[in-house]
Amino acid sequence: MKTNIFLFSVAMIVLLFSCAKDDSNYTYSDGEYINIEGIQNTYTLISQKDRLQLSPVVSSNKDGDFEYRWGIYETSVQGRVEPLDTIARTKDLDYFITEDAKAWVLVFMVKNKKTGFTQYKNTTLNINTEFTRGWYVLKDDGSMSDLDLFLIPTSPKSQERIDNIYSTVNGRKIEGKGTFLSFFTAYKSTITGALGNTRALMVSTEKDIQSISINSLKTIRDKNDIFLGGPKEVGPPSFVFMGSSANYAINKGQLHHIYAMSANGGQFGDRLRIDAKDSPYQLAPTFCASTYSDPILFDNTSSSFVTLANGSGSMMVNFAEDAPTIPLTNMDRNALFIGYKEAVYLPAPVYAFQVNGYGIFQGKSDPTFKSIVYMEQNQQKLKATEQVIESSKKLYNATQYALLNGDENMLFFVNNNQVWNYNLSNAFEQLQFTPPAGEEITFIRHLKYTTAADTGYPFNLFVVGVKSAVGYKVYMFTKSSGNLDATPYQVLEGNGTARAIFYISPNVNEGTFPNN
């Protein structure tokens, strides 16, 4: 039935094109035809990159004065008849593709103004997007952020860079310095016209939090409507990440969430309380989060580990102590780093994953005290084991940290603009990378992609972002036994300061990369 309605709509469009503003009395000659050549039945194109350039050959068995029209309409639209959008009124077409990734129909109409006879040709346009595979780099100029996309058509090695792809699509940049990138496959939105799951890149800056459709790279929500209750001021620390039962946003050190099992429209709820008294709190700008469990968070105000039990409710809870452990509350510590290491499945009677991670902590009353804390999370229970960091260690004066996801028991860190690793089993430290003069390290991260279904794309890379007077570089290293290879696998380069990187492909989901 919908097909019949749709064909009727197209027929009416053609009829209107033939007859609108045309009061002449035409004599239609028998057997008139207009022949259109040079247009294929199907074209496959990349949105925001390709131009469709066609030069059809038009001929007729009648003397004619021709006028032309190109139109495009969307297929498989439920509940409404989609109008034909005119994109040109010339014989030759030169059209930059901006449509969303899906099937469209291109209509070419030729009208003989002398007789009123009209011929049209339909062509299927299969619009794809390059946004769904590649390296996304979140960068800024000190006050405004944007995204660069590095295309990888055959392997993780980049072959082309698209500068400022976010602002190219949306016509504006994102306010604030970049802080974090994450990805949801089931973010709820109405960007397709009906509420449903949306593959969304989550972009966090010091002044904005946005959900962006990875299909079109168009903004779904930003700080004006991504929180319930209307526009909300965003400030550091600001991050969006995933847990086992909810999506989370930290804004100005306060926690918001979207419970995964709730009916929602992609908006984070009100600020969560930390206790029944609604005591003030300030979450550390670091966390251990994955799809295996509720996140491990740390409140620097009360010096306590906290989480949101089962991703639901309006109040965080303290972890129950899983002895033997150091105290988990009122620790007289600030968290400098908390990160995910691995998840281990526990069989009967637990039937759940234990998440293991590490944290770096500094004393409050004695700032010279620093320690490594090994964390073992069994649902709402937490066991924490502490080891003092000696002041002679390079790790003692580290400024940035990154754990290896499930690989060697190594903690990577930055000291004096150099990348080192620290063996968590024996405390051995080793220099790994010194950037060239004039380059300053802006972030480090381990990214491992092992999806067998994505033939040719799996990788295991340690990433180092740097900035210089001329722009940014992102060094990508393979490694062996926890040590970086001397020569980078590849180096991505662009303008501005790189703050974060994320790999996107059709097979990437929330659980592909831990949210460190």
PLM regions: where:
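Positively charged n-region of N-terminal signal peptides that target proteins for export
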Residues: 1-7
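Intrinsically disordered, low-complexity segments enriched in Gly and acidic/Ser/Thr residues
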Residues: 365-474
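Entry beta-strands of beta-propeller and related beta-repeat scaffolds
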Residues: 131-136, 199-201, 357-359, 408-411, ...
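Preference for solvent-exposed, low-hydrophobicity sequence contexts
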Residues: 163-169, 181, 185-402, 406, ...
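Short glycine/acidic-enriched loop and turn motifs that connect beta-strands
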Residues: 141-145, 208-210, 254-255, 418-419, ...
